[in-house]
Amino acid sequence: MFNITNIQSTARHQSISNEASTEVPLKEEIWNKISAFFSSEHQVEAQNCIAYLCHPPETASPEEIKSKFECLRMLAFPAYADNIQYSRGGADQYCILSENSQEILSIVFNTEGYTVEGGGKSVTYTRVTESEQASSASGSKDAVNYELIWSEWVKEAPAKEAANREEAVQRMRDCLKNNKTELRLKILGLTTIPAYIPEQITTLILDNNELKSLPENLQGNIKTLYANSNQLTSIPATLPDTIQEMELSINRITELPERLPSALQSLDLFHNKISCLPENLPEELRYLSVYDNSIRTLPAHLPSEITHLNVQSNSLTALPETLPPGLKTLEAGENALTSLPASLPPELQVLDVSKNQITVLPETLPPTITTLDVSRNALTNLPENLPAALQIMQASRNNLVRLPESLPHFRGEGPQPTRIIVEYNPFSERTIQNMQRLMSSVDYQGPRVLFAMGDFSIVRVTRPLHQAVQGWLTSLEEEDVNQWRAFEAEANAAAFSGFLDYLGDTQNTRHPDFKEQVSAWLMRLAEDSALRETVFIIAMNATISCEDRVTLAYHQMQEATLVHDAERGAFDSHLAELIMAGREIFRLEQIESLAREKVKRLFFIDEVEVFLGFQNQLRESLSLTTMTRDMRFYNVSGITESDLDEAEIRIKMAENRDFHKWFALWGPWHKVLERIAPEEWREMMAKRDECIETDEYQSRVNAELEDLRIADDSDAERTTEVQMDAERAIGIKIMEEINQTLFTEIMENILLKKEVSSLMSAYWR
């Protein structure tokens, strides 16, 4: 077994020549010159080898140095393998050459010791004799016998944990052997960890275990400690002062020690049971999150370096009058605040105080604020002077009855018009229409204000579901009434009841066939629990504003019914009807996309009116069978005749061009395929799996990644991150291409076999 106290060869630093320090550490300088030698999956391991070679530990031997060079050669692309040389000009000479064959790092061993040269510096080491080593080891009080400590830790393990502790020890041995600085002990079900871990470890990850505590005497040079999702109830006051970042989210911590690591810069304690914070938090702290705890008050003086403070979802009734001067983000939503400090930090950019009890905002807010969320409070007015940098303000669900008179003249500093969201406030319909006319004028350059139509002063009483259904199905038998009464226990049944009552007040009830349509649909819902569950969910927010939102929700329910029928086999023997159903869903998706474009260009207009307006007005020209005929507020939707003409043309062109590809990837069609052509479906899926599991997929990814020629960054970690992001994006793109090819092929074959392939031809002339 490996024992760190049983060392075969050691060295001591003898002399340094050319000692002028460089701005870039040697390991980074070398890495920046050779990072292109390695693929993205080998970058981290190669970087660790370079770090070791630039600063060999005192235990380095020729064999260990050689093993690192051999490892680098194996990891490198074949074209660069010869740039990493060992046994060059002698058994104990090693070097790395840059792309232009310039020597950038060399290590030379001799009988006296070894020399490391790189970056214009030369460091020489001499070996310690065996007797010196023995004397040093016997006289050292700090030598740690890791194997003894770890073996005892494994012996103490409960039976169900023993195997995972062995796995943890293997990972720690690997860190020792390969000089790794990151130790991952995630998801091992550990109830404790040993106090002694390899001293070179700077990142310790203990997430998703069953730890109830951390060691009081945790050793090492840890800079980053993650112990999220455990069962911790406290934090030792003796954690290493080297820790700079600590995440202990989703635990059971009830209090913090008065002393935390002095170097701590980032502390995340999301979802614990903390009731108060220590008065003296570390002065270096920059990020503090105690989101979702039970804190009632904050210290009067928080560290001055904090730039991000998240105290959301606690029990705070007030914030400190003096907040850190450099604070840029303050998240204090879901508390019991009734006011804000009179003076907020001058550099504040993000302020979230939503879901509180605030009645008034400071008349002057910091001009640097770009994002302001004061929704779900008790505000009756907004400040006349909004922050100059404001980009988005969320003020929904307050008691606002008017907007600042200065609002139309406000000019934000951002590249886009400021968005001010004031939905679900008690504005009158007349006030909303006046604002819409003002903000829709040609020369208007003020903020874009979003609101919801409707009279919010009306309070509706939600009836029991069976009574709401009887309003549509007047001749229900007692047995049917009892059936709907039983459905009242299902999730969101009350929301659906309110929806039905509100639907009866919409413009569409003027048409007799509308009631017949709804009645038939309700009878279907009574027989289909899965469809009923989907419809009840859609009803959740259907009645929170105007009747047009109710109508839009009804459209969504009809669309969901159509998809449900396709998935459950209603069209298995009627593929022509399935394709027509798919065409309707495709057209509705296109309408939604165009409506979103229109919403971006309008001011003071409820987006519900825009979405419903396009659906309603294009109902006949696009043969939309699931859409109703009428809506109430089309006159304030902002949609013009030219908008409708353009939308119709664009949607028909898109359908002729793209429906074939869209239908091939449509989920309900796949469900039909599995039922009507199970053998062909299995063969196609096997072919798809083969594409992924063989070299074809990775070869295509590598080829496109190579074409990108991602430039090296002076920040090696940043370069690796960019390459990983690019590889992920390319992988998704290629997977989509593979899916499109295979799903299109099987679609064409099955439709041809069923003699309905002509239905995929261009629909519009």
UniProtKB/Swiss-Prot annotation:
- EC number annotated for this UniProt entry: 2.3.2.27
Chain positions covered by the region annotation Linker: 454-461
Q: Which GO terms describe its cellular component?
A: extracellular region; host cell cytoplasm
Superkingdom per UniProt:
Bacteria
Please give the residue ranges the record annotates as the region E3 ubiquitin-protein ligase catalytic domain.
Answer: 462-765
What is catalyzed by this enzyme? S-ubiquitinyl-[E2 ubiquitin-conjugating enzyme]-L-cysteine + [acceptor protein]-L-lysine = [E2 ubiquitin-conjugating enzyme]-L-cysteine + N(6)-ubiquitinyl-[acceptor protein]-L-lysine
For molecular function, the Gene Ontology terms on record are: ubiquitin protein ligase activity; ubiquitin-protein transferase activity
Give the location in the cell. Secreted; Host cytoplasm
Q: What functional role does this protein have?
A: Effector proteins function to alter host cell physiology and promote bacterial survival in host tissues. This protein is an E3 ubiquitin ligase that interferes with host's ubiquitination pathway. Can ubiquitinate both ubiquitin and host TXN (thioredoxin). Leads to significant decrease of thioredoxin activity and increase of host cell death.
Q: What is this protein called?
A: E3 ubiquitin-protein ligase SlrP
